[in-house]
Amino acid sequence: MLRVPLCTPLPLLALLQLLGAAHGIYNVTQRTFKLDYSRDRFLKDGQPFRYISGSIHYFRIPRFYWEDRLLKMKMAGLNAIQMYVPWNFHEPQPGQYEFSGDRDVEHFIQLAHELGLLVILRPGPYICAEWDMGGLPAWLLEKQSIVLRSSDPDYLVAVDKWLAVLLPKMKPLLYQNGGPIITVQVENEYGSYFACDYDYLRFLVHRFRYHLGNDVILFTTDGASEKMLKCGTLQDLYATVDFGTGNNITQAFLVQRKFEPKGPLINSEFYTGWLDHWGKPHSTVKTKTLATSLYNLLARGANVNLYMFIGGTNFAYWNGANTPYEPQPTSYDYDAPLSEAGDLTKKYFALREVIQMFKEVPEGPIPPSTPKFAYGKVALRKFKTVAEALGILCPNGPVKSLYPLTFTQVKQYFGYVLYRTTLPQDCSNPKPIFSSPFNGVRDRAYVSVDGVPQGILDRNLMTALNIRGKAGATLDILVENMGRVNYGRFINDFKGLISNMTINSTVLTNWTVFPLNTEAMVRNHLWGREASDEGHLDGRSTSNSSDLILPTFYVGNFSIPSGIPDLPQDTFIQFPGWSKGQVWINGFNLGRYWPTMGPQKTLFVPRNILTTSAPNNITVLELEFAPCSEGTPELCTVEFVDTPVIS
């Protein structure tokens, strides 16, 4: 307890300062972060301030590695980080909130604070970020007519409930309240969206102010064009722009100045690389080009956020997609200064040298790249085909419907749904099956008749398929959700069979719809079990008409070598001879693999999901083709290597 001698008179202000310091509040109440319009800058505690920040997505990095990545950012000379909060990551079902483990956003922000990093918060509700549906939860689509990112009452009710949960958690973390959050973004690149709904923006401003107060700086970010800023910002929101090395810096900031004649120049997303799509080459930005452009930005006195400073991984099913439909791969490496695995790159050191020209960078050793280990090949054996495993994949039973139901109609938001019916006519001579009146396969469908693979229907390419079978034969269509569109007007991306299926002009009816809980099956039935000998060694049809297999689960185990210090270590898994599917290790969903499409050939395996105390389980769901058959089971292997392959 602070004791002030009564015989020593003190000025009232000095007494309040002592009392405030004793209770830990004085420094908090004096903390300020403001816009200085008169001199085109920020003021932090009354002193001129310029941030050089980097984007990091806690939801793409295991909690185990948060501190390592943040410390590397600090040592690069950054004084702030920028971060999104994806709504769907924290509210997977209406009213079901998750804020623990890898979802503990408050801990992540506190960790940044402890390391001396300020935080630029971007809580959405829409975030883009190449993340499924731009961070909006898929259950919003249960109201099929909903207009997302607008003043649609159904949307606003859901947004209001979410903000009432999230923003009160953020308020104690604001800079003026003793935390690290200096600015908060409202929405995200709203000027790129067709709605241009100012009532929606006003609603958000009102709710942000209600929950966070009037002292925090609220801002917007849009592409550096007048059209985008016209619809993307609003009075009382500070307008910023984003652009990469290919843009003219002067012209980009002239656009900002038309909306913000005074105040700091800000590039909220200065692109260090770019996103990838399956089937396209890996995107890169040359280090020299990036470093030169960063120097020019900083020489103008601009505040800069490097997007991304570390990309991370789209674990599980979290990747987004663009239109025309192009899903993003599991890796979100982004050619960033820190690699997907958190490794230091030439780009990291080049940017650090530039930053050092404008501000002091921390002294001391930079945390090294984490060691990697090649655990070698692991043999896998067949567990069951998807059709054989329906009893455990769909324990609550299927849903009956005259016509196909979408994923959201059966409350299956990610992964896979199996649609089953019977052929209404003889198809001994091949007849085409397709979706009518438009291609309603969302996104990729694996078709079989009486257990014989027929082929693949695809949202973009394979819109019709000839099938064979007798009248009354069982038709199975396994539909994969490959990631929802995260940008543009088509983010209301329904999944499954979203229109009727037709054979020879006959509409197929009387469907049995199986929502597949692959996560529960892997955790409860495959994790920790020995590789199974039941069934055939693979799911291949005996028919020679197709090289495809039935979608099949494969399992295997491997042990961490003994006698080697510091194991387990990070690694990468690759799939020689495999085609496309999903992989889990010890019940953790690493994401999608698709080496036949590329550019990503390996998946990052963080060491925190591995164990030395028991064999490590690998579960693979292969959808198209496995390298092994009954005669060559030794070919059914995956391999752990110490170097990523992305080209």
From Swiss-Prot:
List of residues binding substrate: Y84, E130, N188, Y334
Lineage: superkingdom: Eukaryota
Catalytic site: E189, E269
Reaction(s) this enzyme catalyzes, per UniProt: Hydrolysis of terminal non-reducing beta-D-galactose residues in beta-D-galactosides
GO biological process terms on file: galactose catabolic process; ganglioside catabolic process; glycoprotein catabolic process; keratan sulfate proteoglycan catabolic process; response to cortisone; response to Thyroglobulin triiodothyronine
Positions of disulphide bridges: C196-C231, C628-C636
UniProt KW Transferase keyword: no
Prosegment location in residue numbers: 25-29
Claim: Disulfide bond is one of the keywords in the record: yes
Keywords: Disulfide bond, Glycoprotein, Glycosidase, Hydrolase, Lysosome, Signal, Zymogen
Gene Ontology MF: a single term: protein homodimerization activity
PROSITE patterns xref list: GLYCOSYL_HYDROL_F35
Any one GO CC term of the record: Golgi apparatus
Top class in the EC scheme: hydrolase
Enzyme Commission number(s) of this protein: 3.2.1.23
Signal peptide feature range: 1-24
Record's subcellular location: Lysosome
Subunit note: Homodimer. May form higher multimers.
Family label: Belongs to the glycosyl hydrolase 35 family.
Biological function: Cleaves beta-linked terminal galactosyl residues from gangliosides, glycoproteins, and glycosaminoglycans.
Name this polypeptide is given: Beta-galactosidase
Gene source species: Mus musculus
Organism taxonomic ancestry: Eukaryota, Metazoa, Chordata, Craniata, Vertebrata
UniProt gene name: Glb1
